[in-house]
Amino acid sequence: MVFIMSVSIILLAHAAFQIRGGGKIIYIDLEEYSDPVEKADIVLVTHSHTDHCDPDKINRVRNSSTVLIAPEECRSKIGEVTPLKPGESMAIDGIKVKAVQAYNYKRFRSPGKPYHPKGMGVGYLISVEGKTIYHAGDTDFIPEMKELGTVDVALLPTGDTYTMDVKEGAEAALAINPKIAIPMHTWGKDTAEFKKRVEAKSSTRVVVLQEGEEYHLD
């Protein structure tokens, strides 16, 4: 008997996703309006802001065996965590999670104070079943994106204000060159321009997910 393994990605809300693969359930950036149901094997948090780290939703899916990877500053909200700094990685039952840089250098809450300063949060590379999924977290288009290596799916924020806008998100997609790019953290803004910019200049396919919609990797 041959068992065919697959990987799927569900947009729950905003920047919150469920990834299913390798026999595991992974959640990323659960927030108030996400509605997770299944218990988690792994929970990832990019940073402590409420729209990425909701204690109630995390506790809903957490059990005694759940691996919770999050920055140190999340401890006060969600308890014991395993922090990974950019460049550090962790293997969990055949799934590899690597933290990468995520920060603002051109978006500020006040002069000289970026919304997401370097060192506050991270993005993640999740490798499962031979596929690599990149969740960028809250970030501008940063030079480190060009050094990510092979990425099958890139989850990229395009909503502006706190993150890349559509134009910058497209530039990031072109630099990363994933097989699939999925916009997130859009704040309800139109993603058609993102899709147009990316697909006009690369072989990357843009997949726009609605909340609750699932994408299966080939």
What are these regions (language model features)?
Residues 9-10, 82-90, 118, 170, ...:
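Binuclear metal-ion centers of metallo-dependent hydrolases, dominated by the metallo-beta-lactamase
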Residues 56-61, 83, 144-147, 168-172, ...:
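A short acidic, amphipathic alpha-helical/loop segment
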Residues 31-77, 150-155:
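Active-site metal-binding motif and surrounding structural segment of the metallo-beta-lactamase
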Residues 62-67, 131-133, 179-180:
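Short active-site oxyanion
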Residues 2-38, 81-149, 164, 210-218:
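Core dinuclear metal-dependent hydrolase active-site scaffold
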Residues 19, 47, 97, 138, ...:
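Divalent metal-coordination and catalytic microenvironments
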Residues 49, 74, 103, 140, ...:
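Catalytic metal-binding/acid-base residues of hydrolase active sites
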Residues 147, 153-175:
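Active-site-proximal segments of metal-dependent phosphoesterases and phosphodiesterases across multiple
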